[in-house]
Amino acid sequence: MYAQEAQQKPEAQQSAPAAEQPKPAEEQAKPEQHVTNPNAAVGKELSEASHAAEGEEEAGEHMELKHSTMVKTLAKWLGVSVETSYWIAMAFNFAIVFALLGWAMKKNLPGVFKARNESIQRGIAEARAASDDAKRRLADIEARLSKMDGEVAAIRAVTEKESAAEEVRIREAAEADVKRILESAENEIDAATKQARRDLKSLAAGLAIDLATRKLHVDQQTDESLVRSFVAQLGKDGK
C-alpha cells in the first residue's frame, strides 16, 4: 500500500508541473502594463505568488488524498468511482469522529451532570439552611421584642401602682402629722386654758380672802376651815 502511494506521489508531482506549464504562456500573452510604483508591483507579485503556491499545495494534498491507495482500494471494493469512494471515506471518517465524540460525551457527561446536580442540590440545601436559620433568628428577635413590650408594660403598671400607693401613703402621713399637730396644739391650748383658769381662781381666791380679812375678823380656826374648803374646791375644778 505504501509503495503504491510512493509511486503515485511522483506521478501527482509530475502532473502538477504539467498543469503549471501553460501559465507562463498566459502571462506572456498579457499586455505589458506601465508600472508607476516598483515596490507595489513587486509586493503584488509576491502576494499572488504566495496565494498561488498555497493553492497549489492544498490542491496537491487534496489530489494525493483523493488518489491514495486506500481510496482506490475502497472504490474497487465498492465498485464506484474514485471521487465517490473519496467522499464515502470522508463521510466514514466524520462518522467515526462523531461516534467517538458521542461515546466520550455519553461516558463523561453523566458524571459531569451528576456532580453539577449534586453541587446545585448542596447549594440549595445550604441556602435553605441559611434561610431557616435567618427565620429562626427573626422569630427569636420578634419573641424577645414582644416579651420586652410585655415587660415594659408590667414595669409601667407596677410603677404606676407604687406611685399611687406612695401618694396615698404621703397623703395619709401628712394628714396624720396635721392631726397630731392639731391635737398637740389643742392639748397645749387646753392646758394653758386650765392653767389660766387656775391662776384666775387662785387670784380671785386670794383677793376674796384678802377682802374678807379686811371686812371680817375671823378666828384662826375659821380661817383654816375656809382655806381647806377653798383648796378642796380648787382641786375639783383643776381635774
UniProtKB/Swiss-Prot annotation:
Cellular compartments annotated: Cell inner membrane
Membrane topology label: Single-pass membrane protein
Positions with biased composition (Basic and acidic residues): 23-33, 45-64
GO molecular function: proton-transporting ATP synthase activity, rotational mechanism; proton-transporting ATPase activity, rotational mechanism
Residue ranges crossing the lipid bilayer per the database entry: 85-105
Keyword Membrane: yes
Top-level lineage group: Bacteria
InterPro entries, alphabetized: ATP_synth_b/b'su_bac/chlpt (IPR002146), ATP_synthase_B_chain (IPR050059)
One Pfam family in the UniProt entry: ATP-synt_B
Chief localization: membrane
Keywords on record: ATP synthesis, Cell inner membrane, Cell membrane, CF(0), Hydrogen ion transport, Ion transport, Membrane, Transmembrane, Transmembrane helix, Transport
Cellular component GO terms held in the UniProt record: plasma membrane; proton-transporting ATP synthase complex
Coiled coil spans: none
Family, per entry: Belongs to the ATPase B chain family.
Main function: F(1)F(0) ATP synthase produces ATP from ADP in the presence of a proton or sodium gradient. F-type ATPases consist of two structural domains, F(1) containing the extramembraneous catalytic core and F(0) containing the membrane proton channel, linked together by a central stalk and a peripheral stalk. During catalysis, ATP synthesis in the catalytic domain of F(1) is coupled via a rotary mechanism of the central stalk subunits to proton translocation.
HAMAP family referenced in this protein's UniProt entry, alphabetically: ATP_synth_b_bprime (MF_01398)
Protein known as: ATP synthase subunit b
Organism (species): Koribacter versatilis (strain Ellin345)
Lineage of producing organism: Bacteria, Pseudomonadati, Acidobacteriota, Terriglobia, Terriglobales
